[in-house]
């Protein structure tokens, strides 16, 4: 699957909700006084910049495959401390690094566990690999996108995107126990957990808004030159999402399951 394109402004609409898993992930890193920290899939750099406060002696590098995201992240750059660059996690091969963070990015990387040996080899004793991925199993959003995109009306224009999108057993995301096993066999001490965040979202069609800057973007990008078709497609998506996540008087509940893994080299 090709790297998707993201909308930094849309992504930031739910900045607080997206920041919480990042904070929960990085809070479990216990590497003492790291000198080099890499944040893979750094997005607009808002959370990457906070790492400089936690680790004042470290050089922080944020990497993202989206040029739009890196352009947005540059405002958080601090000469000699925090920098950003366009890059692909699949091709990133460090020589040495103290802490590797990959928050909500590896779900887009097929067979990402094959990258772990190289990353672990780059870590010193007590160095850390910390990542978080949305758990696809039992989460209906991606299936709704794929099903509508593959329907007779949209198949010719969106069918290829729907086929390439990870799904069910074909999703790159593995069971949390598999991550523990793989990393333990590489000589890591692993802290892992699986949890669900229940977000209360406001506004009309907030679940579609949440994913408009990320998972829905490949589909809408393909229709961006046809405003009428784009509006029709979004209307179909919105209707399905309202059925799956019905609004309540206080807002719309979005239960979002996530897997967390923090592994330290022994």
Where do the model's predicted regions map?
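Conserved catalytic/acceptor-binding region of the Class I
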Residues: 113, 128-203, 226
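C-terminal helical/coil "lid" or tail adjacent to the Rossmann-like core of SAM-dependent
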Residues: 3-6, 18, 186, 190-248
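Class I SAM-dependent methyltransferase SAM/SAH-binding core
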Residues: 36-40, 44-92, 114
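Core SAM-dependent methyltransferase catalytic element
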Residues: 259-266
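A short SAM/SAH-binding and catalytic strip from SAM-dependent methyltransferases
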Residues: 99-112, 135
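Helix-to-beta-strand junctions that scaffold the AdoMet/dcAdoMet cofactor pocket
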Residues: 109-110, 123-125
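Conserved class I S-adenosyl-L-methionine
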Residues: 1-38, 46-50, 69-72
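A short acidic, Gly/Pro-enriched loop at the edge of an enzyme's catalytic core
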Residues: 90-100
């Amino acid at each position: 699957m090709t790297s998707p394109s993201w909308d930094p402004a849309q992504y930031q609409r739910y900045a607080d909700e997206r920041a919480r898993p990042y904070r929960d992930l990085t809070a479990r890193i216990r590497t003492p006084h790291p000198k080099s920290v890499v944040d893979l899939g750094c997005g607009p750099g808002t959370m990457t910049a906070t790492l400089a406060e936690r680790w004042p002696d470290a050089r922080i590098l944020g990497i993202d495959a989206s040029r739009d995201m890196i352009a947005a992240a540059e405002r958080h750059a601090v000469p000699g401390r925090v920098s950003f660059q366009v890059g692909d996690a699949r091709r990133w091969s460090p020589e040495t690094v103290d802490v590797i963070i990959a928050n909500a990015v590896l779900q887009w990387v097929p067979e990402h566990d094959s990258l772990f040996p190289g990353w672990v080899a780059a870590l010193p004793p007590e160095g850390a690999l910390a990542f978080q991925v949305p758990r696809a199993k039992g989460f209906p959003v991606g299936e709704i996108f794929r099903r509508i995109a593959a329907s007779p009306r949209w198949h010719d224009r969106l069918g290829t995107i729907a086929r390439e999108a990870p799904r069910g057993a074909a999703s790159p995301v593995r069971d949390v126990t598999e991550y523990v096993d793989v990393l333990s066999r590489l000589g890591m001490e692993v802290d892992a957990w699986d949890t669900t965040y229940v977000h209360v979202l406001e506004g009309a069609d907030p679940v579609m808004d949440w994913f408009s800057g990320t998972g829905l973007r490949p589909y809408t990008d393909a229709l961006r030159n046809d405003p009428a078709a784009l509006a029709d497609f979004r209307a179909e998506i919105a209707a399905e999402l309202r059925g799956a996540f019905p609004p309540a008087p206080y807002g719309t509940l979005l239960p979002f399951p996530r897997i967390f893994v923090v592994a330290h080299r022994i």
